[in-house]
């Protein structure tokens, strides 16, 4: 699967510092919304109550997870995704690790290492 194929899916969970305007997770969230996607916001460290802290808190279908977080936290998210039957992830630069990639391969989770902003730009968004 390619990044362009992932971008075609409509329901996204963006995982990272989604409330901080200086972070890529925030920018990705905004661009996905501008492109007409449904976007769920996840930050495992959030204490504000403004976003979800885990994937299991989302009670709607998630097609793709955008992983924009430190790999040490990212592996926990990927393992949670597997238990919830979520099977597609876009892994942003800096969010990948051998452990994450090996786990995805082992569990048949479809993954693309790439950038959502680049993929959206290719579509003119």
PLM regions: where:
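Hydrophobic, well-ordered beta-alpha structural blocks that scaffold small-molecule cofactor pockets
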Residues: 1-45, 50
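Short acidic active-site motifs
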Residues: 1-2, 50, 54, 73-77, ...
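C-terminal helix-to-coil terminal segments
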Residues: 2-3, 116-125
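A short acidic, amphipathic alpha-helical/loop segment
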Residues: 27-28, 76-81, 100-103
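Mobile, glycine- and charge-enriched loop segments
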Residues: 35-38, 45-70, 111
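A short helix->loop->beta-strand "cap" motif at the edges of active sites that frequently abuts
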Residues: 37, 84-89, 107-109
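Mid-chain, well-packed structural core segment of small domains
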Residues: 55-95
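Rossmann-fold NAD(P)-binding glycine/threonine-rich loop
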Residues: 93-120
């Amino acid at each position: 699967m390619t990044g362009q194929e992932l971008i075609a899916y409509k329901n996204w969970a963006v995982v990272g510092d989604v409330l901080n305007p200086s972070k890529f997770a925030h920018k990705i969230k905004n661009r996905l919304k501008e492109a007409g996607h449904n976007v769920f916001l996840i930050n495992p460290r959030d204490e504000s109550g403004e976003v979800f802290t885990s994937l299991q808190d989302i009670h709607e279908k998630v097609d793709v997870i955008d992983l924009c977080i430190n790999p040490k936290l990212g592996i926990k998210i990927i393992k949670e995704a597997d238990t919830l039957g979520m099977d597609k992830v876009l892994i942003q630069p800096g969010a990948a690790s051998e452990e994450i990639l090996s786990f995805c391969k082992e569990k048949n989770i479809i993954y693309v290492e790439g950038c959502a902003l680049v993929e959206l730009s290719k579509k003119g968004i």
